[in-house]
Regions:
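Short beta-alpha junction loops
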Residues: 89-95, 123-127
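Hydrophobic, helix-prone linear segments
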Residues: 1-60, 202-207, 211-225, 230, ...
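Conserved beta-strand termini and adjacent loop/short-helix elements that scaffold enzyme active sites
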Residues: 27, 120-125
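A detector for small-residue-rich transmembrane helices and their helix-helix packing motifs
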Residues: 99-104, 109-112, 145-408, 413-418, ...
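Intrinsically disordered, low-complexity Ser/Thr/Pro/Gly-rich regulatory segments
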Residues: 88, 112-121
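C-terminal transmembrane module of polytopic alpha-helical membrane proteins
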Residues: 1-48, 58-59, 69, 77, ...
Length: 515
């Protein structure tokens, strides 16, 4: 036979789940204990309701301590700043001994009392007062017509049935959020990445700066020259097998998750814009030659963060803390390793969040907010495009490295054009002029080569290769005396160089034979 307290127990649960939209966290096998979570994180109070006929207050005290330990452990695992629990006991009678002092103040845990457990006992003699006491913490006043329900037993069964029906429907609705689409574009992007990697390898190597530039890596001078497609192409190129492997695995898992949540069309927009915004920030803030899908993959993180903004409880209950930790580790790693293009990662993260906020989640429409985010995105792109084009970042070392690769492959004209279009930097000016002079020698422009080599020596008097090449030019022109002097200078700087010794010996022998 059902008691008034059973009716009260299920009546309160029904109101919380059906009317107040609370979610069932856990329920005991006998349905006598239930934990409920509020619909928003703004309401930090978790509710635990126990249907148990109390006898002695020391049992009550022990149970309250167990609840406190569980809740504090949960708070620390989820890294919450604070967590409160309304711990409600539904009992036919109060404890037989003195008990009110045990529930008068909340139990607390944590250095700054971050965890609080407010305990209440509602028994047959204080139902209305007990409901009134918990109403200010629950932010609503539970109303249960126990007498009516007791006279109609089916009403109690309907209360129970409605609780679990609504709870199951909420679970089903949440599951549908993660199963909206299928990962079609994810697999297409993976295939493109793999195809481009093999193309790079067969074209000279994916770690070759020249090959990367040829196939569309982010290279600031080329973007400034009008090659706008370099804002998109880098996301499909990878530098070495390990780079490809890490990004492909990340795309497989993250991309699949995001595409299932947002659907294929939205995912395509998010991924492409994140890749673009990652390249844009790298263009504006970094001078390095770069490639990789990392920016677009960070955009997937950004999209998941937006999902967390819309569904915070579900986000933190399923993947939230893991996502935040992975993002934090990756960003810290990027700041500590100079070779990582962290600007691209941050740009992708921001771009993914903004793109997700514009297209929004399926079956979610907030036109005003979407318009605001669209305008924010326009401002974001405009600001960093202005910075990139108005205050361009150059790295002459990249140009010199690529030019050297062209020279090694005897593509002298490509190397010459690249060096001539590279802004001179005092730190690399001597190297740049030396490479230009080398190409000019190969092309037979000895006068230009001579001028550049003399300038190199003025900049760096210890540049031994400049003395040597200049000596070769004078030898070619028949000015053996000047050539001998320059070869001697080169040998003074590097006495053990065989080429320098050989040229010096030849010139000395020629001088002696003439004399």
């Amino acid at each position: 036979m059902n008691s008034k307290q059973d009716v009260l127990y299920w009546g309160i649960i029904n109101q919380l789940v059906v009317q107040e939209n609370y979610r069932i966290l856990t329920v005991s096998n006998d349905h006598q204990e239930i934990w409920l979570e509020p619909p928003t994180r703004k309401k930090k109070r978790v509710i635990r309701i126990l249907r148990h006929d109390l006898d002695w207050s020391n049992w009550l005290e022990r149970d309250m301590q167990v609840v406190l330990q569980k809740v504090d452990s949960l708070r620390r695992k989820t890294i919450r700043r604070g967590l409160e629990v309304v711990n409600l006991y539904i009992s036919t009678f109060p404890p037989v001994d003195d008990w009110e002092f045990r529930t008068k103040e909340p139990l607390v845990a944590g250095k700054n009392s971050e965890t609080k457990v407010h305990s209440f006992v509602i028994h047959s003699e204080n139902i209305q007062q007990g409901l009134s006491d918990i109403s200010h913490l629950l932010q609503f006043h539970p109303r249960v017509d126990t007498d009516k329900i007791l006279t109609e037993p089916l009403l109690l069964e309907n209360l129970k049935k409605e609780v679990f029906t609504v709870a199951q429907q909420k679970v089903k609705t949440e599951q549908q959020l993660f199963q909206y689409g299928k990962p079609r574009w994810t697999y297409i992007f993976i295939m493109i990445q793999l195809g481009m990697f093999f193309l790079l390898e067969f074209s000279g190597g994916s770690q070759s700066s020249q090959v990367l530039m040829k196939f569309g890596a982010k290279y600031n001078p080329s973007i400034l020259a009008g090659e706008w497609w370099r804002f998109f192409t880098p996301m499909f190129l990878h530098i070495g097998f390990l780079h490809l492997l890490m990004n492909t695995v990340a795309l497989f898992y993250l991309g699949s998750a995001v595409e299932k949540i947002f659907g294929s069309t939205r995912f395509f927009i998010i991924y492409m814009f994140a890749g673009f915004s990652g390249t844009l920030l790298s263009f504006a803030l970094s001078s390095s030659l770069s490639a990789g899908a990392s920016g677009a993959i960070f955009g997937c993180f950004g999209a998941l963060l937006f999902f967390g903004v819309i569904h915070p409880n579900l986000f933190f209950r399923t993947m939230g803390m893991n996502i935040l930790i992975v993002i934090g580790i990756n960003l810290l790693f990027g700041f500590s390793v100079p070779s990582i293009d962290n600007a691209g990662h941050i740009g992708g993260l921001i771009g993914g969040f903004l793109a997700a906020s514009i297209v929004h989640l399926p079956k979610h429409k907030h036109l005003v907010k979407q318009t605001i985010f669209l305008l924010t995105t326009v401002i974001f792109v405009s600001v960093f495009a202005y910075l990139g084009f108005s205050y361009p970042k150059f790295d002459p070392a990249v140009s010199l490295s690529v030019a050297q690769e062209y020279i090694d492959k005897e593509d002298y004209q490509a190397a010459y054009d690249l060096l001539r279009n590279t802004s001179q930097d005092h730190q690399y000016e001597a190297d740049q002029l030396f490479l230009l002079s080398y190409i000019e020698i190969k092309q037979g422009n000895f006068d230009l080569a001579k001028q550049n080599l003399l300038t190199v020596i003025d900049i760096d008097p210890l540049y031994d290769e400049a003395y040597f090449n200049l000596a070769l030019i004078y030898t070619h022109e028949g000015n053996y005396e000047q050539a001998l002097e320059l070869s001697e200078d080169a040998l003074d700087i590097k006495p053990n160089n065989k080429d320098y010794k050989e040229l010096y010996t030849q010139l000395m022998n020629s001088k002696e034979s003439v004399e």
